[in-house]
């Protein structure tokens, strides 16, 4: 099994079929590659790209142009998230089909639970394509 929650030492040595309990409050917020967007990784599988993350967006923060490589699911815990297709508000859910592309912003800020089957591909003005952490997408995920 390659799935893990980074920076949680209590999971080391657990059997392959043991449940992994995560104290989210004690996980540190990590900066993304985008201003005003921080995250906590709850689950990641470095081999497949499966990712569950808590995302915190400051008021006015934007997730720039990106493509969902597989189905993406977002539950809004606080605030609202807006894109050209519509708006999802606190307590509501949106999912996006594989290969859908958009940018999204949080005018008043937002707290989101995101579930990804493979990380998003972000498109930059210089022509580069990266993942959420700014790593070259193809080198990282198309091995």
Question: Model regions: which residues?
Answer:
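Short, charged/polar surface micro-motifs in flexible loops or helix N-caps
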Residues: 47-49, 59-63, 82, 100, ...
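Ligand-binding loop in jelly-roll beta-barrel domains
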Residues: 98-126
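Glycine- and acidic-residue-biased ligand/ion/polar-headgroup-sensing regions
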Residues: 58-59, 68-83, 90
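Conserved hydrophobic/aromatic beta-strand scaffold that supports enzyme active sites
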Residues: 39-41, 52-54, 73, 93-95, ...
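A short, N-terminal "cap"/entry segment at the start of jelly-roll beta-barrel domains
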Residues: 1-48, 129-143
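Residue-level marker of beta-strand positions
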Residues: 62, 92-93, 111
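Short histidine-centered beta-strand/loop micro-motifs
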Residues: 53-55, 64-68, 84-86, 104-106
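Short acidic-glycine-tyrosine-enriched beta hairpin
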Residues: 82-103
